[in-house]
């Protein structure tokens, strides 16, 4: 018999907690779990005891690396929380989480307001149309300023913040909050770990300001809600319920972003933030329909409901030391019992779900069934990877899959002993399954293993995990940039391979036109053969031969990218032609065309945002230019400056140290991959020389 769902869809929230690194996001999540009864002792990030940061590396570094999923209950509502990393090397984890969330809480440091990485995650959330509320955290910190934080939301994110609270006091005198919706004050009892507070009248010296802010809030809401506008203009009384309904409507439409205040570390404001999650963030039935395609390629809109065929997205793979491979699922429609079969529509393979688990950070509770709107983990899926669609075998649906950026930085890793080799290979395979932006490959010529990822921290953590989880001792080489190669001109060339030396000969002959494509367009192959001059059965071999040759490039051994190849002529031999001969012919055509196609080496260009004190501006801009960077604009940030720049990744190694010394440790920067661009001629010559050329 089917199980009943425990919490109705309308009382389910799937939320993410997102922030700049060090804004206090993990501590805020901890407090949520504490107040919703999920943990009995509070863990602080800075003493390595936090519940959500469950990998050893996270405990050591005090940053959140993988999005742990956990579930909590607040006032008869189920809240599934995904904790997301704030470090730029892990933006993919953030995108992966945003993809399956319905709403998010953005945590700010109330002293700094919106920081560069906040802007990055905010833009990612915009991309996925995720409604958000904002929690101005660390109100107890020296320099904390709620109004400044609200202003930075307006100025830096270009959206309409809606403060629905105001703090009572700040820094050491932060004792509570004024609720601008209900027009009451909450004053905390310092001794009770935030579990006790008194609801009192607004303090006399704050009444006038609170009324002014309440009126401003209602005015903002009236602009986006016609019912409220009418009442407001008529001067009629507007009830608390009407205000809350208008805030909810505006938040779901992303017209406004409610802002709350608090201090997670000092246990203040978390329960009110949880109330706001329930009151203002969407349930699975409030979000826009999700787009999928049926077996015939027709577009279908999916809305949440248990009575529909099962459809879910696998959004993360993790390896658990006790139960093995876990596949995290977001269920969009239908329900699924443990032990049943699903169709992996992406790979067209049937898979059996062994057990279903509800995750609490890294502890699991087994559950018999999952329902529409749930986030859970499954054991037993062997062929499923991140971004795959899992559906009812009788109703195959393809959900929109996830795009992941290519890694931009690589290092060589070498096992210290023969025993370490096997452990390393096994570990790298598992880690690559978990993380689509991490790749491991062996150079066929040198036998060297290269691992590639999104940044130095990303690769540091991979190496740490190899040592810790897979007990593989490895030596790590210097970081190298993942260069690419590309043609800049259209060129045609013949590739002819003839070998006669006793026994069966070899014969393959092709003419191919190569045309450069725009960045990111990949490789396209066009068969323009007329009259069978190259027989049909050899054409796939030509394409394969090109793909293999492109992997090794034409200048310095880097992959050749973004090219259209048109096979338009050639010849064959009745007896001597073979797939192998045509593969070689294709690679010769590529090599010959390269001489006329002006090939270039492309390097990853990073978007680097640097926050520096005014006095260090000149030095830091000089550093950017010296590193072949370009300045793309500046903004004032209080008494600091934010410099937007683009710098080649190859020039960014060791930059953290250089910036620290130029700014006495006060400068910070964030770096994300932006695009590939041709290297200057002199740099290209150096790279070719260093790699011993490829021709």
Curated annotation (Swiss-Prot):
Binding site for GTP: 19-26, 83-87, 137-140
Keywords, comma-separated and alphabetical: Cytoplasm, Elongation factor, GTP-binding, Nucleotide-binding, Protein biosynthesis
Recorded GO MF terms: GTP binding; GTPase activity; translation elongation factor activity
A GO cellular component annotation in the UniProt record: cytoplasm
One Pfam entry name: EFG_III
Domain tr-type G: residue ranges: 10-285
Keyword Acyltransferase set for record: no
Gene Ontology biological-process annotations: ribosome disassembly
Keyword GTP-binding among record annotations: yes
Subcellular location: Cytoplasm
InterPro entries: EF-G-like_DII, EFG_II, EFG_III, EFG_III/V, EFG_IV, EFG_V, EFG_V-like, G_TR_CS
Protein family according to the UniProt entry: Belongs to the TRAFAC class translation factor GTPase superfamily. Classic translation factor GTPase family. EF-G/EF-2 subfamily.
Role, per record: Catalyzes the GTP-dependent ribosomal translocation step during translation elongation. During this step, the ribosome changes from the pre-translocational (PRE) to the post-translocational (POST) state as the newly formed A-site-bound peptidyl-tRNA and P-site-bound deacylated tRNA move to the P and E sites, respectively. Catalyzes the coordinated movement of the two tRNA molecules, the mRNA and conformational changes in the ribosome.
Protein name listed in UniProt: Elongation factor G
């Amino acid at each position: 018999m089917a199980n009943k769902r425990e919490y109705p869809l309308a009382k389910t929230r799937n939320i993410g907690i997102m922030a700049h690194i060090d804004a206090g996001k993990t501590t805020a999540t901890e407090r949520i779990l504490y107040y919703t009864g999920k943990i009995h002792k509070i863990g602080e990030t800075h003493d390595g005891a936090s519940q959500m940061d469950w990998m050893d590396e996270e405990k050591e570094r005090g940053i959140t690396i993988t999005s742990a999923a956990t579930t909590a209950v607040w006032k008869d509502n189920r809240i599934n929380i995904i904790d997301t990393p704030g470090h730029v090397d892990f933006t993919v984890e953030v995108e992966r989480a945003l993809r399956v969330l319905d709403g998010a809480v953005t945590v700010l440091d109330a002293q700094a307001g919106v920081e560069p990485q906040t802007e990055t995650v905010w833009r990612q959330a915009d991309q996925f149309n995720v409604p958000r509320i904002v929690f101005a955290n660390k109100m107890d910190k020296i320099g904390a300023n709620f109004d400044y934080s609200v202003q930075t939301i307006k100025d830096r994110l270009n959206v309409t913040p809606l403060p629905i609270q105001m703090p009572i006091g700040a820094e050491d005198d932060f004792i509570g909050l004024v609720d601008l919706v209900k027009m009451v004050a909450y004053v905390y009892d310092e001794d009770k770990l935030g579990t006790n507070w008194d609801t009192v009248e607004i303090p006399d010296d704050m009444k006038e300001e609170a009324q002014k802010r309440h009126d401003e809030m209602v005015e903002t809401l009236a602009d986006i809600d016609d019912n409220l506008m009418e009442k407001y203009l008529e001067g009629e009384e507007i009830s608390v319920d009407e205000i809350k309904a208008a805030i909810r409507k505006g938040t779901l439409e992303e017209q406004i972003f409610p802002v709350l205040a608090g201090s997670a570390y000092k246990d203040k404001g978390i329960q009110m933030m949880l109330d706001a999650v329930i009151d203002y963030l969407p349930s699975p039935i409030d979000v826009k329909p999700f787009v999928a395609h049926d077996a015939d390629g027709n577009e279908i809109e999916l809305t949440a409901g248990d009575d529909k065929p099962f459809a879910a997205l696998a959004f993360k793979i993790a390896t658990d030391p006790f139960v093995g491979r876990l596949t995290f699922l977001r269920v969009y429609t239908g329900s699924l019992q443990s032990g049943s079969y699903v169709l992996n529509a992406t790979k067209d393979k049937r898979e059996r779900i062994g057990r279903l688990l509800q995750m609490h950070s890294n502890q699991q509770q087994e559950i018999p069934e999952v329902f529409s709107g749930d986030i859970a983990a499954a054991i037993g899926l062997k062929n499923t990877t991140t971004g795959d669609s899992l559906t009812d075998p009788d109703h195959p649906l393809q959900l929109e899959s996830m795009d992941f950026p290519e890694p931009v930085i690589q290092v060589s890793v070498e096992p210290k002993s023969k025993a370490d080799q096997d452990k390393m290979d096994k570990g790298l395979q598992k880690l690559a399954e978990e993380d689509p932006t991490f790749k491991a490959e062996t150079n066929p010529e040198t036998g060297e293993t290269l691992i590639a990822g999104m940044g130095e921290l990303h690769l540091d953590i991979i190496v740490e995990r190899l040592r810790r989880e897979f007990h593989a001792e490895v030596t790590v080489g210097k970081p190298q940039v993942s260069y690419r190669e590309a043609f800049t001109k259209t060129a045609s060339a013949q590739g002819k391979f003839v070998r006669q030396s006793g026994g069966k000969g070899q014969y393959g002959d092709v003419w191919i036109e190569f045309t450069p494509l725009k960045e990111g367009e990949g490789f396209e192959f066009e068969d323009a053969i007329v009259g069978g001059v190259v027989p049909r059965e050899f054409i796939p071999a030509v394409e394969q031969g090109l793909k293999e040759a492109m992997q090794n490039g034409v200048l310095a051994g880097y992959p050749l990218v973004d090219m259209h190849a048109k096979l338009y002529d050639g010849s064959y031999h009745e007896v001597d032609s073979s797939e192998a001969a045509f593969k070689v012919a294709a690679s010769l055509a590529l090599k010959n065309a390269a001489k006329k196609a002006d090939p270039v080496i492309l390097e990853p260009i990073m978007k680097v945002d640097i926050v520096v004190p005014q006095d260090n501006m000149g030095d830091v801009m000089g550093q950017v230019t010296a590193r072949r960077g370009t300045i793309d604009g500046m903004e004032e940030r209080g008494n600091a400056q934010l410099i937007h720049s683009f710098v080649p990744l190859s020039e960014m190694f060791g930059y953290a140290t250089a910036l620290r010394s130029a700014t006495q440790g006060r400068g910070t920067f964030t770096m994300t991959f932006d695009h590939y661009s041709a290297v200057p001629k002199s740099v290209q010559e150096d790279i070719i020389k260093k790699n011993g050329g490829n021709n």
